[in-house]
């Protein structure tokens, strides 16, 4: 495999195991098939950023890492030190967390999402302009060219999620995705009164932007959400920023 993130083949094998564990963690804890998206960004200095968003609970990046830390240590896999948990960064092979390049860019993206999510569009940003390189999309994003071809994550014969890994061209520093989903079991929610079909359908636009090495922004915009049907959602607060350090 290409040395995308500046790590060795051994690191990539360990990475695959970490991805497998994180997938199992994600879907062991899924709730009624809600819209859930996990994004793993692999930087050129070997660090890994993990972001999770779902439509029912807003999971903070630090809380996400603590949960993954507990799960992976239970599996006797790579553990996370306190610095990595607090800074929301994972360094492979116990690398020195203080030694990274300030100009590091994401070189590969892993997207893991629940069965209720459909990836609609992919956009990439070069510098400050947004463009869609058709030839690259056809090569690396088969659902854009030939239909849905993700890796299926199954348990007891049932599809519990999808996973897709792709590499980013060196000249691109940002990626934007539009996703949508519908709850598998909308009747499980206590809506209290009659609602039209739009009250049980949720569409989300997920935008993941890498502004620089220290800052990534994940924006989740919800459409067609009834406050009565979804009282737990703060529909007035759509944008979230995840600071990787004090630098911006």
Curated annotation (Swiss-Prot):
This is Polyhedrin. Major component of the virus occlusion bodies, which are large proteinaceous structures (polyhedra), that protect the virus from the outside environment for extended periods until they are ingested by insect larvae. Glycans are attached at residues 28, 77, 86, 237. GO terms for cellular component: viral occlusion body. InterPro entries: Cypo_polyhedrin_Cypovirus1 (IPR008464). Keywords: Glycoprotein, Late protein, Viral occlusion body. Forms crystal-like bodies by self-assembly. It comes from the Viruses. It holds the Pfam family Cypo_polyhedrin.
